[in-house]
Structure formats: C-alpha cells, structure tokens
Amino acid sequence: MGDKIAVIPGTFDPITNGHLDIIERAAKIFDVLYVSVLNNSSKKPLFTIEERMEMIRQVTAHLPNVQVESASGLTVDYAATRGATAIVRGLRAVSDFEYEMQIASMNRTLNAEIETFFIMTNTKYSFLSSSMVKEVAQYQGDISELVPEIVNEQVQAKFK
C-alpha cells in the first residue's frame, strides 16, 4: 500500500487560523496533503488565486508533506488525478454538517473510491470564517488572533 494521500479543498480567501488548524491536523494523518485552492464563482475574492496560494505556502512551510495547488472543476476529479483516497473537510458547527454531508454524498456517487473525512475545528475557531475576517478588517478591526501574522499583514494592506 502506497502513501495515504488526501486533498483539502477551499477558497481560503484568506486562510484563517481555523483553516490552518485543520491542515496541520490532517497533515499528521496523511502522508501527502494537497491543499487545493479553488475559485468560488459565487464569491468576489479579495485575493487572487496566486496570492492565496503564496500565503498558504508560507504558513504551511513547516509541514513538509503539504503541497499547495490551484484546482478547478469537481474536487473529486481533482483528488483522483492526485491519487488521493480522501477529501478532508473541516466542520465548525452542526450547521456546517448538513451542507458538507450533501457534498460528501455527491462525491461518493461520483467516485466511490474517495472517502470524505470530517475534522471538527478547534472550538476556539468554531465561529471563524474568511468572510468574517474580511468584514472585521474592512472596518479596521483587529484580526491578529484570527489569521497567521503574514496573512494579517496582507489583509491589512488590502484595506489601506
């Protein structure tokens, strides 16, 4: 049996401490973890895909088994091209579960070989979202406890 490979998809606009917590914990379980940065067509991004990928690379540099790539199309198809047997999703609250369960069921229908793993976020991040970070920063609120330092600097620069 080869490496245990997983994909953790997301918009990561920007990456938060909650995202990083899930990535670090998944990196302990899987031999290779692809962080796939997606463009969400229903959201207007603050950062380009390239900017998001660079921030993620910087904040995951201490995790040698993490690779950062951009992806488009179906996550389950992307996972298959990477030889992944798992998709990792973070759950903040019960409210996330129903939506994530629907996606997991659809992915299972599309490719039964790829499992979905849910990791519960650390309770101190259960309220945290990229949207919330952007909203607080837009009004000059302090986001230093919500995102890694390099991300804080980049977000602040966008709202100057």
Curated annotation (Swiss-Prot):
<dbReference type="GO" id="GO:0005737">
    <property type="term" value="C:cytoplasm"/>
</dbReference>
<feature type="binding site">
    <location>
        <position position="19"/>
    </location>
    <ligand>
        <name>ATP</name>
    </ligand>
</feature>
<feature type="binding site">
    <location>
        <begin position="125"/>
        <end position="131"/>
    </location>
    <ligand>
        <name>ATP</name>
    </ligand>
</feature>
<keyword id="KW-0963">Cytoplasm</keyword>
<comment type="function">
    <text>Reversibly transfers an adenylyl group from ATP to 4'-phosphopantetheine, yielding dephospho-CoA (dPCoA) and pyrophosphate.</text>
</comment>
<dbReference type="GO" id="GO:0005524">
    <property type="term" value="F:ATP binding"/>
</dbReference>
<keyword id="KW-0173">Coenzyme A biosynthesis</keyword>
<feature type="site" description="Transition state stabilizer">
    <location>
        <position position="19"/>
    </location>
</feature>
<keyword id="KW-0808">Transferase</keyword>
<comment type="subunit">
    <text>Homohexamer.</text>
</comment>
<feature type="binding site">
    <location>
        <position position="89"/>
    </location>
    <ligand>
        <name>substrate</name>
    </ligand>
</feature>
<keyword id="KW-0548">Nucleotidyltransferase</keyword>
<protein>
    <recommendedName>
        <fullName>Phosphopantetheine adenylyltransferase</fullName>
        <ecNumber>2.7.7.3</ecNumber>
    </recommendedName>
</protein>
<dbReference type="GO" id="GO:0015937">
    <property type="term" value="P:coenzyme A biosynthetic process"/>
</dbReference>
<comment type="similarity">
    <text>Belongs to the bacterial CoaD family.</text>
</comment>
<keyword id="KW-0547">Nucleotide-binding</keyword>
<dbReference type="Pfam" id="PF01467">
    <property type="entry name" value="CTP_transf_like"/>
</dbReference>
<comment type="pathway">
    <text>Cofactor biosynthesis; coenzyme A biosynthesis; CoA from (R)-pantothenate: step 4/5.</text>
</comment>
<keyword id="KW-0460">Magnesium</keyword>
<dbReference type="InterPro" id="IPR001980">
    <property type="entry name" value="PPAT"/>
</dbReference>
<dbReference type="InterPro" id="IPR014729">
    <property type="entry name" value="Rossmann-like_a/b/a_fold"/>
</dbReference>
<feature type="binding site">
    <location>
        <position position="100"/>
    </location>
    <ligand>
        <name>ATP</name>
    </ligand>
</feature>
<feature type="binding site">
    <location>
        <begin position="90"/>
        <end position="92"/>
    </location>
    <ligand>
        <name>ATP</name>
    </ligand>
</feature>
<keyword id="KW-0067">ATP-binding</keyword>
<feature type="binding site">
    <location>
        <position position="75"/>
    </location>
    <ligand>
        <name>substrate</name>
    </ligand>
</feature>
<feature type="binding site">
    <location>
        <position position="11"/>
    </location>
    <ligand>
        <name>substrate</name>
    </ligand>
</feature>
<feature type="binding site">
    <location>
        <begin position="11"/>
        <end position="12"/>
    </location>
    <ligand>
        <name>ATP</name>
    </ligand>
</feature>
<dbReference type="GO" id="GO:0004595">
    <property type="term" value="F:pantetheine-phosphate adenylyltransferase activity"/>
</dbReference>
<feature type="binding site">
    <location>
        <position position="43"/>
    </location>
    <ligand>
        <name>substrate</name>
    </ligand>
</feature>
<dbReference type="InterPro" id="IPR004821">
    <property type="entry name" value="Cyt_trans-like"/>
</dbReference>
